[in-house]
Amino acid sequence: MATIYKGLTLDKFQEDAIAAMENNESVVVSAPTGSGKTLTADYIIDKYLKQKKRIVYTAPIKALSNQKYKDFSLEYGASNIGLMTGDIVINPTAQILIMTTEIYRNMVMTGDESVKDIAYVVFDEVHYINDIDRGTVWEESIIYSPDSVRFLCLSATIPNAEEFAAWISAIKHHKVKTVKSDTRAVPLTHMFYDFELGITDLNKLNKHLKAVKDMPSYDNVFKKRGRGRNGRNQRLTQPQPDHIDLIKRLGPDKVPCLFFSFSRRDCQEKARQLAKTNIFKAVPEIIKICQEHIKNWPTEVKKLPTTALLRVSLAKGIGFHHAGLLPMLKELVEELFSKGLIKVLYTTETFAVGINMPAKTVCFNALRKYDGRSFRGLNTKEYFQIAGRAGRRGIDKEGLVVSMVYRQTFRYKELKLLTDKDILPIQSQFKLSVNTTLNLIDKHSKEEIEHILRLSFYSYQKFGDKYADVETRRILYRYNRIRKKLERAGFLDPKNHTLTEKGKFSTKIFVDEIILGEIFASEIYKKFNDCQTLLLIAALCYEPRERTKFKKVFPNSDYRKLKALIAEDPITAKEPKFENLKDVTAMTVPIIEGGDFFTILNNTNLLEGDLIRFYGQILDRINQLRKASFEHTLTNKMDCVEGILKRALEGIYLV
C-alpha cells in the first residue's frame, strides 16, 4: 500500500529515505531536480520538531536559505525557525536552524557548544561539493561534525552516490543509506533554437548545419578573432539567434518560460527588448499588484532605473531576476511568478538553485558561462540543474528545454553528451585553509591532526591507489607550510606547538585570518577611529572589477592616516587588498558623514544587490571580530561601526 505524506503519494525513493531516517541512519538522496527530494527533509523536520530535537538545514547560497526560512516559518511557525547567513542572525536558539553551509562548517570547526544538541543536518544541493572554490566546505562540515549527528544529503543525480555514502560511513562510523531515483516526475524534451530552422532537435540541426557550405569551424572562429578587422568582421557577420523570435516561436501554450542568461545586465536588456514588442499585452492584475508593492517602497527605490524598467516589463508579464536586484524587487517578481502572472522571466542561474518555482519551458541564452576564471561550456550537472526547472508536477506532461545555438561554436558530440543525462560524479575539492589549520592545532595533537587530514573524500576515493599517498603528502605539505607561516606571523609558538593570543583570536576568523588577527588581537586597532575601522574592513571585503566605476572618491585625512598606520606593521604593509583603500572610500566615507545607501549608489555603477552584498560581507566580518574578541573595547568598537552601517542601510537591507 502506498504511503501518503502531506496529502502526497510518496515515490519509492522517498519511502526508502524515510525508512532509513526512522532507523537513525544518515541518507544520501540522489534524484533529478524537481523530483521531490525536499519532501524527505520535510519529514525529518516534522519528526524531530515533535521530539524537541534540533535540526540544521544548510543551503549553498543565501537565496535558498532565505527562501527556506520563509517557507518553514509559514509551515512550522516563525518561533520555531532561525536563520544564520553571516550578516543576518534571526532566532539563533530556534529548534530548526537554516544557514549557509559555510556557517555550519564554521560552527563545527570552532567547537560551537550548540552543535552538541543537533540531531540531524540536511545538506541541500550537496553536489556543490564539486565546486572548485567552495567544495571543501561540505567535506569539512561532514568530517568535523560530532559522531552523534546524522546527515540527510540531497543531491541532483550523481553516479557515485554509493561511494560518497560509503565515505561518510567510514569516517563517521554509522550506517549511511543510499537512495537513488533516475526518473523525473515530468520528463524533459531537449530542443535547440537556430536562427534559420527555429526550434528543432539536435539531429535535424546537425544534419542541416553539415549541409551549410560557409559554416565556420569552431576552432577557426577563435583563431580569426582578433587577427585584424577582417577576421573580426567575419565572426560578426554570422547571423545570431534572436531571443524575441524564440519567444514568438514558443507561442502562448509553452509559457511560463524561464529564460536563463549568465549575465545580469543581459537579463535586464532582454526584458527591455521583449517589453517593447507587442507579443504580450498589459495585464491589469499585474499592474494592481505592482502598485500595492511599490507604494510602500522608499522614494529612492521608486526612482531607481531598475524599478522603472521592472514596472514597464512586468506590466506585460515580462520580468527579470538576479542577485543584483534589491530584495524588495525580487520579492515582487517572485510573487508574480508564483501566481502564474509572468509569462517570460529572464534570470541568472541562482534562480535554479534558490527558488523552487518551475515553469513549462526553460530556455538557455547560451551553454557557456564565465566561472570566475574563464569562459567554458556548462557541465552536465549545471545544465540539468537549470533544465530541471522545466515541467510542473501535476500540470505539465513534459518540460521543454530550448538552447539557443551559435553556429560558430556548434559541436554536435558535446551537445549530445551534455543533454543526454547527468553523468558528472562528485569529486573531492578538499583544500586546507588557515582557519582549519588554526583550529586543528588548537584542539588536536600532531598525531591526531595527521589522522584527520587523511579523512578527506579524495583520500577515500584513492584508497589503495598509487596516488593516495601522493595526495596525503600534498595535504600534509600544505599543512606544514601554513604552520610555518603562522609561526613567522606570531600566531603559533613553535616551541610547544600552541597558539598565541593572536592565533586563538583567529580561530573564529574565517577569511583574512592573519591580517585581522594581527590588527584586532593586538593594540593596533585602538589607533583607528570608526571611519578608519570601517574603511579597513571594507577594503578586505572589496573585490575590484574592471567595469566598476566611482564618480568620486574621498581620500580624506582618515584615509591618509590609515595608510600610514598600515605601512608601519610588516604584516599589514604587505597586504595587497589595502591597495584598494582609495576606491573603498567612495563606499564608506559618505556613510560615516551621514549619507545613506542611495548616496553611495548614485556615486557608482554597481548594481543595487551587489552593493548590498558588499555591505553584507562587512557586517559578517564585524560579527566574526565581535565573536573572536577577548575584550570589551573591541566589542564596543564593532557595535559602534555596525550601528553606523546599519543606519545607512535602514529600510533597504532585508532578508
What positions do the PLM features span?
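Conserved C-terminal RecA-like helicase domain
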Residues: 54-58, 65-69, 73-83, 260, ...
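SF2 helicase catalytic motif II
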Residues: 97, 101-104, 109-152
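Motif I (Walker A/P-loop) of helicase-class P-loop NTPases
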Residues: 37-46, 134-139
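Conserved interdomain linker/interface between the two RecA-like ATPase lobes of SF2 helicase motors
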Residues: 143, 150-152, 157-169, 173-273, ...
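Inter-Walker segment of RecA-like/P-loop motor cores
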Residues: 73-112, 180-186, 190-193
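C-terminal accessory/connector segments of nucleic-acid motor ATPases
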Residues: 328-337, 427-536
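Conserved segment of the helicase C-terminal RecA-like domain
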Residues: 149-150, 357, 361-371, 375-417
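Conserved pre-motif I regulatory segment
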Residues: 1-30
